[in-house]
Regions:
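Intrinsically disordered, low-complexity, positively biased terminal segments
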Residues: 11-13, 24, 29-141
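Conserved hydrophobic beta-strand within the GNAT/NAT acetyltransferase core sheet
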Residues: 16-20
């Protein structure tokens, strides 16, 4: 992704966008902390049914992110260790991939719970401002 950022800068793009699975903790950390992206929206079942071995039986919810291509280098964020009192915390499992491989129903429970929380938070005008040390998205209204 860093190489893509520099390529975009060299080619005069102002922003890069993509999606990622909101339940995958390592992707959340990469996108929010290492890359410092902004989450713009939540899309339930974005790709529809994906019958491959990894995704079969799951719903393809995705967060849409945008990454500003400004300055000399990408800006990283810190993990949030102490959220503010009014922040909404959206917990995700530390390893959804392991859960998905063992218990599809548990995976779907997580998927639907996180979906509901994100949609409610965005409906209230919430913005994702970080990711906590406890595998939680930090949403500020």
């Amino acid at each position: 992704k860093i190489d893509q950022w520099y390529w975009a800068k060299k080619n005069y793009y102002s922003e890069i966008s993509w999606t990622f699975d909101p339940l995958v903790s390592r992707n959340a950390k990469l996108n929010l902390i290492k890359l410092g992206v902004n989450i713009s929206s939540y899309h339930p079942n974005f790709y529809g049914d994906m019958p491959d071995a990894l995704n079969a039986g799951d719903e393809s919810d995705r967060l849409m992110v945008s990454w500003k291509v400004v300055g000399e280098n990408p800006v990283q964020r810190e993990l949030v260790s102490t959220p503010k009192p009014n922040d909404i915390l959206i917990q995700i499992p530390a390893d959804i991939v392991a859960i998905r491989s063992k218990d599809r129903e548990e995976n779907l429970r997580w998927r639907r719970k996180v979906r509901e929380q994100f949609l409610q938070a965005f409906e209230k005008g919430g913005q994702v401002v970080g990711f906590s040390t406890n595998s939680e998205y930090v949403v500020r209204i």
